[in-house]
Regions:
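Conserved G/P- and acidic residue-centered "switch" motifs that form tight phosphate/ATP-binding loops
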Residues: 43
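ATP/NTP-dependent adenylation/nucleotidyl-transfer catalytic domains that generate, transfer
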Residues: 2-38, 48, 52-55, 60-63, ...
Length: 322
């Protein structure tokens, strides 16, 4: 048996029923709200969350909010709309471009970009990316800026720590504006906001504090990403969504979660996180999965470091005990 097998849910129907009960209990009894709002991103996590909400409450009590902006992948909106139609839920589309412009989100990032690449214009696309094959490298490598011009040529530039943090902070505004948009609609309709952060992301802090982490319910929080895919298959989530590479969808040039943050596949992430949880030795995992020990040791260290640095994201703010 491989460690991937341990993450396989043989009782998936029961898990789905329990998730539905969890949602209904919180909406009807704990929070006493009229329904649920889900931010539909066109990705698998939000698709599973929305489908579970419909199964728990019925389609008339679920609202799908679609929040594109000028740098969003057009497929995100297309997939979200088709899913909503399949689920027969009401949707609202709120374009966030003007709000983000008022925060100077695009300008802040583009000022840094133009210092590196003066030829940058509206025909160019860009992203921040971590180096390829990160686990095979001998040292920890810093994320870099990648720009695609109108001729599809790619240019790479190193970023200083200050430049990286500035671009990251500006990008986080996108997630925080999504959160405020969700809560505006939630409060005026007396609906709960349901998040879609999974365990693989939660452990490493791959969410924005008071952004996509700012929600009322997190049904997927204790499910690894590979388990979310199992639920998606059980729920018959469209293949155009399940086959799509997971992405933050916050950069004009598309970048996957693996390329932007993790530096490894979800198979590795989930297997190692499971091993940490169950105190399984690293060497045993490598032998079981036939993985290179040095590469997996580096992956283990990367996950542990992210887990430690993101502790504050999984806890309430410290308070003075008076």
């Amino acid at each position: 048996m491989t460690y991937g097998d341990f993450l396989k849910m043989n009782n998936i129907e029961n898990v789905v029923e329990r998730l539905q009960d969890f949602i209904k209990e919180n909406v009807d009894n704990k929070f006493k709200r009229k329904g649920i709002i889900v931010g539909l991103s066109g990705g698998v996590d939000s698709a599973v969350t929305a489908t579970l909400a419909v199964k728990a409450l019925g389609s008339k009590r679920v609202l799908g909010l679609i929040m594109p902006e000028k740098e969003s992948d057009p497929k995100s909106k297309e997939f979200a709309e088709r899913l909503a139609k399949k689920l027969e839920i009401k949707t609202e589309i709120v374009d966030l471009t003007n709000i983000l412009e008022s925060f100077r989100v695009y300008n802040i990032r583009e000022e840094i970009i133009k210092e590196k690449f003066p030829e940058f214009d509206n025909n160019c696309k860009y992203r921040i990316k971590i180096p390829d094959e990160l686990l095979k490298k001998n040292s920890m490598s810093f994320p870099f800026l990648e720009i695609e011009n109108s001729f599809k040529q790619i240019f790479k530039f190193r970023l200083s720590l200050e430049e990286y943090l500035t671009m990251y902070a500006a990008t986080s505004i996108k997630l925080r504006v999504r959160m405020t948009t969700l809560y505006f609609n939630g409060e005026k309709n007396q609906y709960l906001i349901m998040g879609s952060t999974n365990k693989s992301e939660a452990i490493q802090g791959y969410f924005v504090k008071y952004g996509d982490g700012g929600v009322d319910l997190e049904p997927l929080w204790n499910l690894y990403k590979t388990q979310v895919y199992q639920i998606a298959k059980f729920l018959d989530i469209p293949e155009e969504i399940t086959q799509r590479k997971p992405s933050p969808d916050t950069w004009s040039l598309n970048v996957s979660d693996e390329e932007f943050f993790f530096g490894m596949t979800y198979d590795i992430i989930d297997s190692l996180c499971y091993a940490m949880e169950k105190n399984i030795p690293l060497k045993e995992i490598c032998e079981n999965k036939n993985w290179n020990y040095d590469e997996v040791k580096k992956a283990w260290s990367m996950i542990e470091r992210k887990k430690e640095l993101s502790i504050h994201m999984r806890e309430m703010p410290p308070t003075f005990d008076f």
